[in-house]
Amino acid sequence: MPADLHPDLDALAPLLGTWAGQGAGEYPTIEPFEYLEEVVFSHVGKPFLVYAQKTRAVADGTPLHAETGYLRVPKPGQVELVLAHPSGITEIEVGTYSASGGVIEMEMVTTAIGMTPTAKEVTALSRSFRMVGDELSYRLRMGAVGLPLQHHLGARLRRKS
């Protein structure tokens, strides 16, 4: 456990660090695409992890997306993800986690989505994370622009530090 990590985060301590890898996205309204991703989990000694994510195009490194926020642990086995996107969207996801035998799994669904007047309509999001050793994978499902919740993104990341 890192020094000064809040004790409520002990089970999620293996997430701390920088993760990088590749993912793929699809949605009925866009062409399928691949991306490079970096995710950083850090902490400030309070009962939440700081989360920062950014992606770029595989072909030329063009920035694609970013999001930042906090992964809160209100009580053992429960998580709350609070995120802001530069596309004008904020989201709150609530769910559960389990941590055992070197495996961490999280399942979350949105309970609230905020949008600026110019943001594209997003009505639902859900995420699944799975960390095994030095590999972190996730799936993101999205309901947007009049379509129901469905697969949108998936990636496999490896620990860099």
Curated annotation (Swiss-Prot):
- A Pfam family matched by this chain, by name? THAP4_heme-bd
A GO molecular function term, named singly, is:
heme binding
Which parts pass through the membrane? none
Q: What is its EC number?
A: 5.99.-.-
InterPro entries cross-referenced by the UniProt entry: Calycin (IPR012674), Nb(III)_bact/plant (IPR022939), Nitrobindin (IPR045165), PeroxynitIsom (IPR054873), THAP4-like_heme-bd (IPR014878)
**Source species, domain of life:** Bacteria
Q: Which reaction does it catalyse?
A: peroxynitrite = nitrate
Q: Which residues bind heme b?
A: H152
| UniProt pathway | Nitrogen metabolism
**Note on cofactor:** Binds 1 heme b group per subunit, that coordinates a highly solvent-exposed Fe(III) atom.
Required co-factors: heme b
The motif GXWXGXG: which residues? 17-23
The protein's UniProt keywords, in alphabetical order, are: Heme, Iron, Isomerase, Metal-binding
The record's subunit annotation is:
Homodimer.
Protein function: Heme-binding protein able to scavenge peroxynitrite and to protect free L-tyrosine against peroxynitrite-mediated nitration, by acting as a peroxynitrite isomerase that converts peroxynitrite to nitrate. Therefore, this protein likely plays a role in peroxynitrite sensing and in the detoxification of reactive nitrogen and oxygen species (RNS and ROS, respectively). Is able to bind nitric oxide (NO) in vitro, but may act as a sensor of peroxynitrite levels in vivo.
Q: What is known of its domains?
A: Forms a 10-stranded antiparallel beta-barrel structure able to accommodate a hydrophobic ligand in its interior. In fact, this fold hosts the heme group, which is located in a wide surface cleft.
Similarity field:
Belongs to the nitrobindin family.
The family database entries (NCBIfam families) matched by this protein are listed as:
PeroxynitIsom
Q: What is this protein called?
A: Peroxynitrite isomerase 2
